[in-house]
Each structure stands twice: as structure tokens, then as C-alpha cells.
Amino acid sequence: MSRISSLQDPFLNALRKEKVSVSVYLVNGIKLQGQVEAFDQFCIVLRNTVNQMVYKHAISTIVPAKSVRMIYNSFNPYHQNSNDEQDENVDDIHSDDLEIQENEGNIHE
């Protein structure tokens, strides 16, 4: 079954590929830190001293240690961008750099 690519997939994939350190805040207030090792539709594998599988429904917020710029129009047809200005202090992530999986069951590694 194919699906419209969400904002989650390109964002998490950029964090994974760039090995960006992240702080993951859970809905119960716990803060986890590490790097996104892999992810699928339901969970994220977070690597620090050990690997942790975190279910997405338990996540409140993901905060990257550095800025990640996404080109939303390439991934989300519902996003309307009024201007295409680039912020030179933000990393550019281009659609051809991202591996978007059409199959919901695939894990990105």
C-alpha cells in the first residue's frame, strides 16, 4: 500500500543519515538522548551507549542538536510555501538526498 510521504520520514531520515544527536522527549516527561539509528511507521531506534526502541506514540518532541532544513514541497503536497528563501545558517536537505520508502513496513537503515 502506498502512502503520501509525511514530514516524519524525511526529517527522521535526514537525522539518521547526518548522524545528528537528538533529544527525544516522551509524553511522560522523560528525556532520551542519542542518534536515530533506524525507524519505521511505529517506532524509532535511538542509539547512545545502548540501542533503545521507542514507540512513536510515546514521543512528544524530537529536538536535533543542529538545525535541519527540509524542502517541504517535495514531500508534502499540502504544504504551501509563500517564499523560497534559503537560510544560510541552516543545512539544506534535498529530495534526491533522501531515501523515501513507499512501503509502510520498511525500516530505514
UniProtKB/Swiss-Prot annotation:
Subunit note: Homohexamer.
This protein's name: RNA-binding protein Hfq
InterPro entries named among the record's database cross-references: Hfq, LSM_dom_sf, Sm
Keywords: RNA-binding, Stress response
Residue ranges, annotated region (Disordered): 77-109
Entry annotated with the keyword Zinc: no
GO terms classed as biological process: regulation of DNA-templated transcription; regulation of RNA stability; regulation of translation, ncRNA-mediated
Gene3D superfamilies: 2.30.30.100
UniProt function note: RNA chaperone that binds small regulatory RNA (sRNAs) and mRNAs to facilitate mRNA translational regulation in response to envelope stress, environmental stress and changes in metabolite concentrations. Also binds with high specificity to tRNAs.
Domain of life: Bacteria
Keyword field contains Chloroplast: no
Gene Ontology MF term list: RNA binding
Protein family (similarity comment): Belongs to the Hfq family.
Annotated Sm domain residues: 9-68
Gene: hfq
GO CC annotations on file: cytosol
